Amino acid sequence: MAKSHLPPWLLLLLLPTLCGPGTAVWATSPLACAQGPEFWCQSLEQALQCKALGHCLQEVWGHVGADDLCQECQDIVNILTKMTKEAIFQDTIRKFLEHECDVLPLKLLVPQCHHVLDVYFPLTITYFQSQINAKAICQHLGLCQPGSPEPPLDPLPDKLVLPTLLGALPAKPGPHTQDLSAQRFPIPLPLCWLCRTLLKRIQAMIPKGVLAMAVAQVCHVVPLVVGGICQCLAERYTVILLEVLLGHVLPQLVCGLVLRCSSVDSIGQVPPTLEALPGEWLPQDPECRLCMSVTTQARNISEQTRPQAVYHACLSSQLDKQECEQFVELHTPQLLSLLSRGWDARAICQALGACVATLSPLQCIQSPHF
């Protein structure tokens, strides 16, 4: 099989997905999936949500044998797994995280940040590598037929859990942990905050638009017809997938496993402003920009408090209050409905007509280029 030229960053982004179906971030109602292939194959997201990717690739987007799809999927996962073992992959991430430790605003946190990296970074990488199961991943995507149940993930090794935290954690962990040593620091040391902050910095620095083209290179390993469809889908959806995986799954998985942090991210956090979005996500159209800002803030809040969060978003100094309130009054019901299905901000704003939509998978299939 041809060698992949994907950048090593890609594996970091896919690790949460590769660690098993328990980390799935999308949620589509059973009633929606019950509509059948007409609903499943409208988009890559819906095919994944309804676990019908294999059906759509075989019957709607192209014609290829089930065994071929299963084998190609496992080959791709194995390529990505090998990439995590490359020194350049680990060194690049390690150097970036060390720099982030150095520039922490509170200098008292710098030594402890470096200590956490020295001790737990190699252990975490090794643990994730050992948990990747190509067949289970491809079964979860619907590209391999279900067989015998796969063995569950190994429990987190004791050496991966901060031992000094175990005795101090409450019965129900909160979103913040306490000081490792009250004698060394005059204020509580928020390790969970530190963990999430470092991961968000990684998210912000990754050029998602550039990666979209790089991800499509992996499509050369699949059959010709499906390969063309794969390339179109990869270029269209990579940014969406990266935003979801990095923004939601990775912080919860890594920080939850290593630091036993709560998975409830909304407690004590300020909704991100428009400036927190990666550069390529800042639209020029005012209505699209407004929609992206409101939707992004609402996505990072628990479902119960989203209606209030949508209205509070208009208080942002970056938005025109009157235009924002008009937009919210008009679109809130549909916006909340799409948020509950797990849609990302750009897809929602395209569905609402606020942002210009690019090619859909069905348009890709009809393209004369393949």
From Swiss-Prot:
It is found in: Secreted, Extracellular space, Surface film. Residues 1-24 form the signal peptide. Disulfide bonds join C70-C144, C73-C138, C101-C113, C192-C261, C195-C255, C219-C230, C288-C355, C291-C349, C314-C324. Residues 66-148, 188-265, 284-359 form the Saposin B-type domain. One of its GO terms (biological process) is respiratory gaseous exchange by respiratory system. Glycans are attached at N300. Residues 25-184, 264-370 form a propeptide. Keywords: Disulfide bond, Gaseous exchange, Glycoprotein, Repeat, Secreted, Signal, Surface film. One of its GO terms (cellular component) is alveolar lamellar body. Residues 26-66 form the Saposin A-type domain. InterPro entries: SAP_A, SapB_1, SapB_2, Saposin-like, SaposinB_dom, Sphingo_Act-Surfact_Prot. Pulmonary surfactant-associated proteins promote alveolar stability by lowering the surface tension at the air-liquid interface in the peripheral air spaces. SP-B increases the collapse pressure of palmitic acid to nearly 70 millinewtons per meter. Pulmonary surfactant consists of 90% lipid and 10% protein. There are 4 surfactant-associated proteins: 2 collagenous, carbohydrate-binding glycoproteins (SP-A and SP-D) and 2 small hydrophobic proteins (SP-B and SP-C). Homodimer; disulfide-linked. This is Pulmonary surfactant-associated protein B. It comes from Oryctolagus cuniculus (Rabbit). The lineage of its organism: Eukaryota, Metazoa, Chordata, Craniata, Vertebrata. The gene is SFTPB.
